[in-house]
Design a protein with these regions (language model features):
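Mixed-charge interfacial surface used for oligomerization/domain docking
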Residues: 3, 13-23, 27-30, 94, ...
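N-terminal glycine-rich anion-binding loop in soluble enzyme alpha/beta folds
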Residues: 3-63
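Hydrophobic residues in alpha-helical segments
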Residues: 50-51, 76, 137-138
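Glycine-rich, highly charged phosphate/nucleotide-binding loops
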Residues: 61-71
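Glycine-rich phosphate/diphosphate-binding loops that line cofactor/substrate pockets in enzymes
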Residues: 69-82, 219-228
Length: 332
């Protein structure tokens, strides 16, 4: 059996994770000295007070090394293999913690097989590759094929989101105070996205309505050009604007009801109130992954993944062969 492991920032609803047999390792939120497990929190209840948090923004932290090891050890003890897909390594140390944990477990269980994928994003932009791996597992594919399914999904996804205010981004050090003040005064509404594993600006418009319109038209252009495999509407804070946007705008575009899912507070507390959309297309979306020159984006991801591990953990055994195998599989 293949165990699929991820983190709570993927924002997969608890019931869905249980139904799909996805092991979720929780990150943490510390508010006023009290630590909460992200995976166990009622996100809507947390977000009710989000406006009161702006002058004392909670602190987030990654899973403990012990918790990460336990997730992999559960699989090893049962004689199962494991595929881990985690939050972008450029946003958190969670992926690196998974690398260390899997190595330690493998040293205790010599027959334990595992693969790790840097999800290169967060929220459902991270979850779509996980869903592809689950689908591959559930039709009987082997561990390498499940890994390949996740890797190939990464360049097919996009996450667009627009914060209601720039204040949280300023408080979190993402933008300067003057820029936040001026932006709020002129109702600047940036649309953010994730590119090469990092949050960046997708577009800038004036007013919340124009931001929603721009995200909708960009989504429509992408699915017209590259097809659609899945979509959810995300929110941070009040869910009603997201529900309305999903019902009135996004669902009619795709001809079915679109789910509305809260973003993990680990991400939400850095952004503040926001509405967004995370979707996966049938084909790679230009601009999601930009590094390198090879036309095969999935191939570049596999190479970058193993090179990143090699540079940080040079004592890993025989990664040259591992990289060659992944590249060979992806070329087929």
């Amino acid at each position: 059996m293949i165990r699929i492991i991820t983190d709570s920032v993927a924002s997969i609803p608890k019931a869905l994770a249980e139904e799909l047999n996805i092991k979720v390792v929780s990150l943490y939120v510390n508010r006023d000295g009290v630590e909460y497990r992200d995976a166990d929190m009622d996100h809507d209840e947390f977000y009710r007070d989000i406006y009161d948090m702006v002058n004392n923004i909670p602190i987030s932290s990654q899973p403990s090394q012990l918790e990460m090891e336990e997730a992999f050890e559960e699989a090893a003890e049962a004689g199962d293999s494991a595929l881990g897909v985690f939050l972008s390594s450029r946003m958190s140390g969670t992926y690196d913690a998974a690398v260390r944990a899997a190595r330690i477990v493998a040293s205790r269980y010599p027959d334990f097989e595992y693969r790790l994928v840097d999800g290169m994003s967060n929220s459902f932009d991270e979850a779509w590759p996980i869903m592809e791996a689950v689908a591959a597992r559930d039709v009987g594919e082997d561990l390498d094929s499940c890994e390949k399914a996740a890797l190939r999904a990464i360049p097919r996804t996009r996450f667009l989101f627009s914060p209601e205010t720039l204040t949280f981004l300023h408080k979190g050090g993402r933008i300067g105070g003057a820029a936040a003040l001026l932006g709020n005064m002129i109702q600047l509404a940036p649309i953010l996205t994730v590119r090469d594993g990092e949050a960046t600006t997708f577009a800038k418009v004036r007013s919340r309505k124009k931001a929603l319109d721009k995200m909708a038209t960009s989504f429509k252009a992408d699915i017209d050009a590259y097809g659609l495999r899945g979509v959810v509407v995300h929110y941070i804070g009040d869910k009603e604007p997201a529900i309305k946007w999903a019902k009135d705008v996004i669902s009619p575009m795709v001809g079915r009801t679109v789910g509305v899912v809260p973003v993990s507070p680990v991400i939400g507390l850095h952004v503040g109130p926001a509405v967004g959309i995370a979707y996966e297309c049938e084909k790679p979306i230009p601009g999601k992954i930009t590094h390198g020159v090879d036309e095969s984006i999935a191939l570049r991801l596999a190479a970058a993944l193993s090179e990143r591990i090699e540079s940080r953990l040079p004592d890993l055994p025989d990664l040259t062969k591992l990289k060659s195998r992944i590249l060979h599989d992806l070329e087929r």
